[in-house]
Amino acid sequence: MCDEDVAALVVDNGSGMCKAGFAGDDAPRAVFPSIVGRPRHQGVMVGMGQKDSYVGDEAQSKRGILTLKYPIEHGIVTNWDDMEKIWHHTFYNELRVAPEEHPVLLTEAPLNPKANREKMTQIMFETFNTPAMYVAIQAVLSLYASGRTTGIVLDSGDGVTHTVPIYEGYALPHAIMRLDLAGRDLTDYLMKILTERGYSFTTTAEREIVRDIKEKLCYVALDFEQEMHTAATSSSLEKSYELPDGQVITIGNERFRCPEAVFQPSFLGMESAGIHETTYNSIMKCDVDIRKDLYANTVLSGGSTMFPGIADRMQKEITALAPPTMKIKIIAPPERKYSVWIGGSILASLSTFQQMWISKQEYDESGPSIVHRKCF
């Protein structure tokens, strides 16, 4: 279908960040916030060549005069006009390519509604005139990136967490679990517990600082109660962090109390099961004959699985839930923050994949519903 010399574009649209680049590369060229900002008041920026909307980093830096919107909520696109702006920005400003010259591989959340897949397909062919496109499930791409076709993926990003069992390259929809608890909630929780310590973080700018503290200093305790005891009786776990204004703050048990919420959602006032139990529940919804393969191939993916100690803790928790003789292996690839994108880069450059693309011709003949026949 497509010439060998034209690289496919791979775009992974997350709730928090958009990752984009060229198939065959080992990392995305562009990573920017999935936000669209519009001026709060017309004419505030007279003479500044004011645009009617800003995307990504530019929206982030001008947020004082803008109203910011996230078009992707909990992994699912909810605002198509803004989503179109993000894609336009991706192609023309970040990658600087003409989308009508490249096949485009997009990613979607597990259990993405059918209408959404059709809308994505329609926008790619009708607005951007792409010659070919494909929609792949994010967790499946992460599994490919780890060199597997069977396993269970715990994918936790900024807006949503999923556990997705995959057998021979196909996600098993009946066993997919979704948990609306992810990076954004952990940042909010850290803001809250730092406020209890007497530090005030309230504005969106301060929220970015807290996110940085979370990414640099937080970790998952192997034994939460014991870690709390250690923190209470010594200062060995305390770390200091310098704020942009030069003030230095000290953070102690908050370092592991924050990510503990993914194992104990009750910390956030949520009634759901933690990620370990959710993973176990997903496995138990699968055929008894494939469970062994899932336990032995549990792959972590997404930015919110980057906490040090999370793999060991998962190993411990799942071992406690699983049958006693079961072999359990948690795989935490170092590049897992971008493993969805990397899996897409691998998939789109496989020679065997080239016949899988939906071509413009097929789209013109069948319409948007073609996506359900060709992407599964």
UniProtKB/Swiss-Prot annotation:
GO terms for molecular function: ATP binding; hydrolase activity. This is Actin, cytoplasmic. It is an enzyme of class 3 (hydrolase). CDD domains: ASKHA_NBD_actin. PROSITE patterns: ACTINS_1 (PS00406), ACTINS_2 (PS00432), ACTINS_ACT_LIKE (PS01132). The modification N6-methyllysine is found at residue 85. Belongs to the actin family. Keywords: Acetylation, ATP-binding, Cytoplasm, Cytoskeleton, Hydrolase, Methylation, Nucleotide-binding, Oxidation. The modification Methionine (R)-sulfoxide is found at residues 45, 48. One of its GO terms (cellular component) is cytoskeleton. The modification N-acetylcysteine is found at residue 2. The keyword Nucleotide-binding applies. Transmembrane segments: none annotated. Actins are highly conserved proteins that are involved in various types of cell motility and are ubiquitously expressed in all eukaryotic cells. InterPro entries: Actin (IPR004000), Actin/actin-like_CS (IPR020902), Actin_CS (IPR004001), ATPase_NBD (IPR043129). It is found in: Cytoplasm, Cytoskeleton. It comes from Biomphalaria pfeifferi (Bloodfluke planorb). It catalyses: ATP + H2O = ADP + phosphate + H(+). Its EC number is 3.6.4.-. The modification N-acetylaspartate is found at residue 3. Oxidation of Met-45 and Met-48 by MICALs (MICAL1, MICAL2 or MICAL3) to form methionine sulfoxide promotes actin filament depolymerization. MICAL1 and MICAL2 produce the (R)-S-oxide form. The (R)-S-oxide form is reverted by MSRB1 and MSRB2, which promotes actin repolymerization. Monomethylation at Lys-85 (K85me1) regulates actin-myosin interaction and actomyosin-dependent processes. Demethylation by ALKBH4 is required for maintaining actomyosin dynamics supporting normal cleavage furrow ingression during cytokinesis and cell migration. SMART domains: ACTIN. The modification Tele-methylhistidine is found at residue 74.
